[in-house]
Amino acid sequence: MSRPIVISGPSGTGKSTLLKKLFAEYPDSFGFSVSSTTRTPRAGEVNGKDYNFVSVDEFKSMIKNNEFIEWAQFSGNYYGSTVASVKQVSKSGKTCILDIDMQGVKSVKAIPELNARFLFIAPPSVEDLKKRLEGRGTETEESINKRLSAAQAELAYAETGAHDKVIVNDDLDKAYKELKDFIFAEK
């Protein structure tokens, strides 16, 4: 089994865009660990593909049943990666990719038998990140402020050396090349 790859970084840094490019170019090499969440789907998101959308009661039941490798609560919503989702990717012969937050990274690091590799996607600046979040048109001012506050904590954590690699996404093509270089350096 190849080592899982954990990708994290503040909301709005381009993680989803980079991963969509990777999956489009290498559809048979990587599998996405589909996270579960209690938040409302955004326009265009598909249940079971982008996230597994569940109720708060369902999520809490999953916590009690130890179904998560990691889970966290952010902006009033729960997010988590299930053991079943990671196993499903591994059984398919693909490298598992987990897109998780800082709390999730800490949880996965506490499970050494996963032998995961950690990649952080950073914005060029907090100001640039704010522009990206505002440009989505899906965030309230309060939500943007919460995300920026969380981003500052995540950026500080990334500076501790908690990740194997940090990529600053100031140019999508350059960031994508760095992503591929990291992923294919050791499978």
UniProtKB/Swiss-Prot annotation:
Which residues does the annotation say bind ATP? 9-16
**Residue limits of the Guanylate kinase-like domain?**
2-184
Annotated residues that bind GMP are located at 35, 39-42, 51, 70, 79-81, 101
Show the SMART domains listed in the entry. GuKc
What the entry lists under Gene3D superfamilies is as follows: Guanylate Kinase phosphate binding domain, P-loop containing nucleotide triphosphate hydrolases
User: Which reaction(s) are listed as its catalytic activity?
Assistant: GMP + ATP = GDP + ADP
Please name the PROSITE patterns in this protein's record: GUANYLATE_KINASE_1, GUANYLATE_KINASE_2
Q: Which GO terms describe its biological process?
A: GDP biosynthetic process; purine nucleotide metabolic process
Q: Which domain of life is it from?
A: Eukaryota
One GO cellular component this record assigns the protein to is:
cytoplasm
Provide the E.C. number(s) assigned to this enzyme: 2.7.4.8
Keyword flag Acetylation: yes
Instruction: Print the miscellaneous field.
Output: Present with 20500 molecules/cell in log phase SD medium.
Question: What family, per the record?
Answer: Belongs to the guanylate kinase family.
UniProt name for this protein: Guanylate kinase
* Organism encoding this protein: Saccharomyces cerevisiae (strain ATCC 204508 / S288c)
